[in-house]
C-alpha cells in the first residue's frame, strides 16, 4: 500500500506484522479496560439498562428484537462474577466489550497502514469520546455492537490481505458467522453487513473462487451465527421469568418480536414524528465534530483522497468503509422518527451514531498514517514519525482530559436512589401500575434483581394492553386479581376469545390492596373516574375511592417528607435519564400543593373549605419556593398565583402588601426564566395590574 508509519512495511514479514498487531491490540485493550473499569457506575444506569439486566437475571426476553446474545452473556456474567451488585456486573461486562472494540479498531488500522500511532488514534479518540465512553460503561447493547463493528472491519481487512484461496475461504466463513452473530445483538449493524457481503462475494468471484459449495458453507455459517435466537422461544415456552416481553412460542409471535413490529420495524419508536432527514444528518455531523473533533473528520476525508492514488486493493477497503458510513447515516436519518429538538430524544438518537463514529475513527487513523507517509516522502524527514506519535498522543489525551469528569460515573447512583425512594414510599402489599421507561425499568430491576420490597406487585400499564402480557405474567403476580385477559376501555370478548376489562373493574377486584400509578395513568381509559380519584403520592399518585373525604392536613403530613432527595436542581444534562429522574423528584414536592390548589379552584367547594385549601396551598408553595435557591421555574408561577388568590380572600391574617410584593416578584422571575410560555404576555399584563394595585395600596397606607 505504500504506508508504513512506524510499524514497517507489510511486506517486511507476516510474523512481525501479525505479532505487532496482536501486541498492540492487547495493550489497547488493557488500557481502555482499565479506564472503563475505573469509571463505570456501581449501581443501575438509566435508559434500557434496568430492563436488559432484569431480562438477563430472570432469563426472560428483552424488548424487541430480544437481544438474545447480550441476554445470555449478561446472565452468564451475573452468575459467574460473585462481587458487586447485579447492575455492576453487567456494567463491567459492557466496559470489557468496549475495550475489545477499541482493540479491534487498532487492529484494523494497523493492518491497513502499519502505523501503531494511527491505530492508537482511532481506538483512543473513539473510545474516549463522551458518547462512546458513556454508553460503554452502562449495561446497554451499544458496546457489544461496537465490538461487532470493529470485528467485521478487522475481518474485512484480513480477507483483503489473504493471499491463498483457502485462507480467504476460512476468513469468509468466520465473517459470515460473525455477521449472523452480530444480528443477535443490535439490528442496525445489518446496514454494514449489506455492504460487506456483496463486496466479499465480488472479491471471491473476481478470484474465481465463488463456488456453489462455498456459497452453501457461508450460508450455513451465517445461519449458525443466528442460533442464539433459539433462546427466545425456549425462554417463552418455559415461562419461568418474572419479567419478559412477548410470546415467541409461535412463529408469528417470534417474527413480531424479531422484526420489532410493536415499535415499527425500521423505526426507533412507535407513533412518533421525527425531524427531517437533513436536520438529522446535519445534527450527526455537528455531533461528530463535538465528539471526535474537526481534525478527526478532516483526517477521515484525507484518507479517502490520498488513498485513491495508492494501492487499489487496499483503497477498495477504505471505500467500502466509507460506503458503509454513508449508507448507514442516510438510512438512519430517514428512519430516526424522533424529534431531536427535544433533549431526551436527542440523547436516544445520538447513541446510534456510535456505529458511524467507529468508521470515522478508523478512517482518521488511516488519514494520519497517510499524511505522515506523504510528508515523509516529500520532505525525507525521519522526525515526522515522532510527530505522528505526538499527534496521536495529544488527540487521545485531550479526549480523556475533556471527558473524564463527565464520564466518571463511580458515584452516580441517581437512578438507583430514584427507584429506591419510590419503592420505600409504598405501603405494605401495594399494587404499582407502572408507566414509562424510567420508573418501569428501574423499579423492576430493584424488585426482581436486588430483591427490594418483595411484598409489592409491579404491573405495567402499557403491557396490559398487549395480548401476550397477562397470559405470561399473571402467574407471577399472585396477589393481583385480573378480571380478564387484556386491558381495554371497552369490555367484551375478542374474536380470539380473550376477555377484556377496564381499569375500573380492575380496581374493584383489587380493593383489598392500595393501588398507585407511577408515573401517570393511561389516558385511553377514563372508566376509573366513575368511583375513584387520584391523590398525589410524591412522583406517583394513589387511586382512592371517591367516597373517601380528602383531609388536607393529614395528606400534607403523609406526603411532606415522602422522599429523601438531595440532588441539586439542574445538576445533570437535559438529555440524560438522571435529569429526568431529578426533575421528577423535584416536581414531586410541588404535587401536593398543586393538588390542593386545584381542589380550591373547584366551583363545588364551599367558601370556608375553599379558603382553607387556598391557605394550605399558599403555605406549602411558600415553603418549597424558599427551601432552595434553585428550583423548577414553574414554582414561581404557581406560588405567585397562590399569593394572588390569598389576596382576594377575606381574613387571611397576611398583610396584603406582602402578598402583592410576593406575587409581583415571582411572576417577574417566571417571565424572565420562562421565555417560551404561551401565557407570558398575559402574565406580563397581570404584572402591570398588580404593580398598580401595590402602588395604590402603599399610597393608602401613607395617607
From Swiss-Prot:
Free-text function comment from the UniProt entry: O-mannosyl-transferase that transfers mannosyl residues to the hydroxyl group of serine or threonine residues of proteins. Specifically glycosylates the IPT/TIG domain of target proteins, such as MET and MST1R/RON. TMEM260-mediated O-mannosylated residues are composed of single mannose glycans that are not elongated or modified.
Main location: endoplasmic reticulum
Entry membrane topology: Multi-pass membrane protein
Enzyme class at the top of the EC tree: transferase
Places the protein is found: Endoplasmic reticulum membrane
Phylogenetic placement of the source organism: Eukaryota, Metazoa, Chordata, Craniata, Vertebrata
Record-level GO BP terms: protein maturation
Protein name: Protein O-mannosyl-transferase TMEM260
Keyword field: Endoplasmic reticulum, Glycoprotein, Glycosyltransferase, Membrane, Transferase, Transmembrane, Transmembrane helix
InterPro entries the UniProt entry points to: GT117_domain-containing, TMEM260-like
Family recorded in the similarity comment: Belongs to the glycosyltransferase 117 (GT117) family.
Superkingdom in the source lineage: Eukaryota
Catalytic activity, reaction form: a di-trans,poly-cis-dolichyl beta-D-mannosyl phosphate + L-seryl-[protein] = 3-O-(alpha-D-mannosyl)-L-seryl-[protein] + a di-trans,poly-cis-dolichyl phosphate + H(+); a di-trans,poly-cis-dolichyl beta-D-mannosyl phosphate + L-threonyl-[protein] = 3-O-(alpha-D-mannosyl)-L-threonyl-[protein] + a di-trans,poly-cis-dolichyl phosphate + H(+)
Gene Ontology molecular-function annotations: dolichyl-phosphate-mannose-protein mannosyltransferase activity
One Pfam family per UniProt: TMEM260-like
Glycosylation sites: 403, 564
Keyword Repeat set for record: no
Effect of gene knockout: Receptor maturation defects and abnormal epithelial morphogenesis.
EC number(s) reported in the record: 2.4.1.109
Annotated TM spans: 20-40, 68-88, 90-110, 137-157, 182-202, 218-238, 314-334, 352-372
GO cellular component: endoplasmic reticulum membrane
Amino acid at each position: 500500500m505504500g504506508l508504513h508509519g512506524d510499524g514497517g512495511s507489510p511486506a517486511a514479514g507476516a510474523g512481525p506484522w501479525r505479532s505487532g498487531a496482536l501486541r498492540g491490540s492487547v495493550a489497547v485493550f488493557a488500557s481502555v479496560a482499565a479506564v472503563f473499569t475505573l469509571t463505570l457506575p456501581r449501581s443501575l444506569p438509566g435508559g434500557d439498562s434496568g430492563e436488559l439486566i432484569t431480562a438477563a437475571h430472570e432469563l426472560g426476553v428483552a424488548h424487541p428484537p430480544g437481544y438474545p446474545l447480550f441476554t445470555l452473556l449478561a446472565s452468564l456474567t451475573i452468575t459467574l462474577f460473585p462481587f458487586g451488585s447485579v447492575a455492576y456486573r453487567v456494567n463491567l461486562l459492557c466496559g470489557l466489550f468496549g475495550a475489545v472494540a477499541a482493540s479491534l479498531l487498532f487492529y484494523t488500522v494497523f493492518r491497513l497502514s502499519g502505523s501503531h500511532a494511527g491505530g492508537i488514534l482511532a481506538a483512543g479518540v473513539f473510545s474516549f469520546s463522551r458518547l462512546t465512553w458513556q454508553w460503554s460503561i452502562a449495561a446497554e447493547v451499544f458496546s457489544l455492537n461496537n465490538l461487532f463493528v470493529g470485528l467485521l472491519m478487522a475481518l474485512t481487512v484480513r480477507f483483503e490481505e489473504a493471499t491463498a484461496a483457502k485462507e480467504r475461504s476460512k476468513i469468509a466463513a468466520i465473517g459470515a458467522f460473525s455477521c449472523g452473530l452480530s444480528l443477535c445483538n443490535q439490528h442496525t449493524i445489518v446496514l454494514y453487513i449489506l455492504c460487506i457481503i456483496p463486496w466479499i462475494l465480488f472479491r471471491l468471484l473476481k478470484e474465481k473462487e465463488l463456488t456453489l459449495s462455498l456459497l452453501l458453507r457461508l450460508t450455513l455459517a451465517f445461519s449458525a451465527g443466528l442460533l442464539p435466537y433459539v433462546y427466545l422461544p425456549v425462554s417463552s415456552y418455559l415461562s419461568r421469568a418474572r419479567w419478559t416481553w412477548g410470546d415467541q412460542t409461535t412463529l408469528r409471535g417470534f417474527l413480531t418480536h424479531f422484526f420489532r413490529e410493536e415499535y415499527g420495524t425500521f423505526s426507533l419508536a412507535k407513533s412518533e414524528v421525527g425531524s427531517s432527514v437533513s436536520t438529522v444528518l446535519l445534527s450527526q455531523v455537528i455531533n461528530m465534530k463535538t465528539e471526535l473533533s474537526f481534525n478527526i473528520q478532516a483526517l477521515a476525508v484525507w484518507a479517502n483522497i490520498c488513498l485513491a492514488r495508492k494501492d487499489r486493493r487496499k483503497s477498495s477497503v477504505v471505500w467500502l468503509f466509507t460506503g458503509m458510513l454513508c449508507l448507514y447515516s442516510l438510512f438512519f436519518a430517514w428512519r430516526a422518527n424522533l424529534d431531536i429538538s427535544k433533549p431526551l430524544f436527542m440523547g436516544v438518537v445520538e447513541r446510534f451514531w456510535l456505529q458511524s463514529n467507529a468508521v470515522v475513527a478508523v478512517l482518521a487513523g488511516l488519514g494520519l498514517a497517510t499524511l505522515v507517509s506523504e510528508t515523509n516522502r516529500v520532505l525525507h524527514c525521519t522526525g515526522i514519525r515522532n510527530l505522528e506519535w505526538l499527534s496521536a498522543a495529544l488527540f487521545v489525551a485531550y479526549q480523556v482530559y475533556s471527558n473524564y469528569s463527565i464520564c466518571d460515573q463511580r458515584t452516580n447512583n441517581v437512578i438507583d436512589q430514584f427507584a429506591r425512594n419510590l419503592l420505600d414510599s409504598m405501603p405494605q402489599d401495594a399494587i404499582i401500575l407502572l408507566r414509562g421507561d424510567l420508573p418501569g425499568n428501574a423499579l423492576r430491576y430493584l424488585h426482581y434483581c436486588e430483591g427490594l420490597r418483595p411484598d409489592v406487585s409491579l404491573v405495567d400499564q402499557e403491557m396490559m394492553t398487549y395480548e401476550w402480557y397477562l397470559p405470561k405474567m399473571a402467574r407471577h403476580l399472585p396477589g393481583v386479581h385480573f378480571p380478564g385477559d387484556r386491558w381495554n376501555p371497552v369490555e367484551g370478548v375478542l374474536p380470539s376469545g380473550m376477555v377484556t376489562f377496564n381499569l375500573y373493574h380492575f380496581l374493584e377486584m383489587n380493593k383489598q390492596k392500595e393501588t398507585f400509578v407511577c408515573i401517570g395513568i393511561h389516558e385511553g381509559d377514563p372508566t376509573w373516574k366513575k368511583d375513584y380519584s387520584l391523590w398525589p403520592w410524591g412522583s406517583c399518585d394513589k387511586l382512592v375511592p371517591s367516597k373517601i373525604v380528602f383531609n388536607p392536613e393529614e395528606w400534607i403530613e403523609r406526603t411532606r417528607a415522602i422522599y429523601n432527595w438531595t440532588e441539586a436542581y439542574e445538576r445533570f444534562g437535559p438529555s440524560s435519564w438522571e435529569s429526568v429522574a431529578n426533575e421528577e423528584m423535584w416536581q414531586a414536592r410541588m404535587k401536593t400543593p398543586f393538588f390542593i390548589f386545584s381542589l380550591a379552584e373547584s366551583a363545588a367547594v364551599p367558601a370556608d373549605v375553599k379558603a382553607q385549601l387556598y391557605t394550605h396551598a399558599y403555605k406549602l408553595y411558600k415553603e418549597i419556593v424558599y427551601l432552595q435557591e434553585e428550583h423548577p421555574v414553574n414554582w414561581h408561577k404557581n406560588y405567585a398565583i397562590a399569593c394572588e388568590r390569598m389576596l382576594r380572600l377575606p381574613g387571611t391574617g397576611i398583610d396584603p402588601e406582602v402578598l402583592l410584593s410576593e406575587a409581583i416578584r415571582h411572576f417577574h422571575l417566571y417571565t424572565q426564566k420562562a421565555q417560551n410560555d404561551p401565557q407570558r404576555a398575559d402574565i406580563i399584563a397581570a404584572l402591570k395590574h398588580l404593580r398598580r394595585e401595590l402602588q395604590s395600596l402603599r399610597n393608602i397606607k401613607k395617607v
